[in-house]
C-alpha cells in the first residue's frame, strides 16, 4: 500500500468517525504516548525488563500501527505528503549520508 493511500484511508476514517483532527500539539502528545507503548512492548519482548506479573507483553505490530496512524494524521492535518517526506529522506540519505555508515 502506498503512503498516499494510507493517508487517504486515515483521512476518510477521521472524517467519518470523529469531529476532526486533533491539534498538532495534541497529536505530538499522542505520538509520544504511542511511542512509549511501542517502547514498552519492545522492551518486554526483547529487553532486560520483563512484564510485571499479570501484565501483557504488548503487540509490537499493533503498537507500530498505532504510531503510524497518529503520524499520518499529523501529516494530513499539516498538509504534508508522506510520499514527499519519504522521497526527501531518501535523497538526504543517498546524497549527504552515502558514506556515513560504511565500515
Question: What are these language model-derived features?
Answer:
Residues 1-64, 68-103:
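Flexible "arm" and connector segments at domain edges
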Amino acid at each position: 500500500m502506498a503512503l498516499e493511500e494510507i493517508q487517504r484511508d486515515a483521512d476518510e476514517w477521521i472524517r467519518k468517525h470523529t469531529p476532526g483532527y486533533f491539534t498538532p500539539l495534541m497529536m505530538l502528545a499522542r505520538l509520544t504516548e504511542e511511542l512509549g507503548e511501542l517502547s514498552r512492548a519492545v522492551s518486554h519482548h526483547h529487553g532486560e525488563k520483563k512484564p510485571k506479573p499479570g501484565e501483557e507483553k504488548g503487540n509490537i505490530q499493533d503498537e507500530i500501527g498505532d504510531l503510524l496512524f497518529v503520524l499520518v494524521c499529523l501529516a494530513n492535518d499539516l498538509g504534508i505528503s508522506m510520499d514527499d517526506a519519504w522521497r526527501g529522506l531518501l535523497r538526504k540519505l543517498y546524497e549527504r549520508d552515502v558514506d556515513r555508515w560504511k565500515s
